[in-house]
Amino acid sequence: LRRWTRRRTRRHRRGVWALVGDIYSGLLTIVVVGTILVPHLSRLVAARPPSSSQEAADLGVLDLDPGWLVLALTMLLLILGIGPLSRLGPLFLRPHEAAWWLPMPGDRGTLLVPVARVEYLIAATAGAVMGVLPALASAGGWGAAVAWPVLIAAGTCLVLSELITAQVQGRGVTCLRRFLILFGAAACLAGTTFPFPRSMTGNVVVATLAGVLVAAGTLRWRQARLVLGHVRDDGLLTVVARSFGAHVSLLSLDTRAVGRLLSPALPRPAAPSPLRLARIGRRLPRSVRVLTGVAQADWILLRRQPRRLLQIGAGLAVAVLPLLSESVGIPMRALAYLAGGWIATLAVAEPARQAWFDGAADTSWPVSPWLVRVGHLLVPGLFMSAWSLLSLAPAMTSLGAAGAWKALGVVAALALVSGWAWAGAALRSGFRAMPDFAAGLVTSPVGSLPPGLVQMLVEGPDAALVGALATALVACGIAAPTTTVLGIQAAAGAVVILWGVRTNRRAS
């Protein structure tokens, strides 16, 4: 049956040499870009001073080794990735394969084994690439260069086996996610106590652990192979439709639709909501009642999506962990802080995205559209203000230990002000306009693109950069926490909030 499918679809394929050419072009691009960026990226990691651990201990701040930091961030990447992977299968078929194969009698296992093999190959390759980072951090020579990629590759294959088992059994990935969270937390705790394995003995321990994981991965693959035929057809058809929808959304450059497809369905409410916030504003003026009503709806939407809280925590980890390592350069800390803030902002931007998908609820309010937009700022502003306070905890701890109470107050005010700037960026990202494919395509070196593509891609990140740059500079130690910086942050936050309220006003 597989041979018949290949014959039927052969004329629609580009051929093996086209695939080889794509792989060659991709590898050549990676090599050229890496050769250009490596000398500059190496400057972002500072030399580890011998007294850094003692100074960090005096300030009450943890000092993480960069190797353990890389491992923790790798676990964080896996934690964020298993949700979308479980939505896409991981076992899946192409639409024509599902149409031709599933109606046939017989065992599904032999049809899905080649798919699983390719996915294991992709998982092992991705794990080996991620394993290069801890190998570079350990500076342990060829032993570390081999042991760490094998270790991470075996770990990703084990994660894939658990995802396949969860798909076959029809259960969620909550247990797997909790295990990865515990493992990442253990890496952070180990970084505060034990040095990263750099010696020959450490490389032997890593190689032994890699061998154990390879054996466990092989055993889990054999177990998963036996149950591949138990995958339900309706589950495969659902995955096929979801994968095809994600592919079409990527072709149309609609990242919001991709995120909606990869997100789990909202749970149905078990009981009516008490609507406490809306009840409080019942006796207030109409404009205030609308603000509280919009905020109440946004809070209900976020409360029904617990994964958003996990995403906010992941953004906090990305922003804070580099601040706890003395070996990470200041520019890299600033980039990590902005990246972590953007990850958290995407989580709290869900109400704005939902309002963009279905604007009927916003148009039903008896006030101006801009006031409804302001209501969508309240819940993200509160969440991101709390996030900013937690992200600036290392800086506030250092200032408190030094007795700089005025600077400590400025940092706390910066956190509160920057939280509303992040909320404005969330509003701008959620309500951004789509490119107009009907207006004709623009020829570019990477192909024909619709007008307005660049504007769509930068709407949101541009506001985040403008609104949070001052706070990021203070968090990384580049700028001192002064009232001048606070004034700059307040002005930038006001601009970003106005920016977000006025973004794509025609959609309201």
Language-model regions, residue ranges each:
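Hydrophobic alpha-helical transmembrane segments of membrane proteins
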Residues: 1-98, 107-360, 368-508
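Alpha-helical transmembrane segments that serve as single-pass membrane anchors or pore-forming helices
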Residues: 101-102
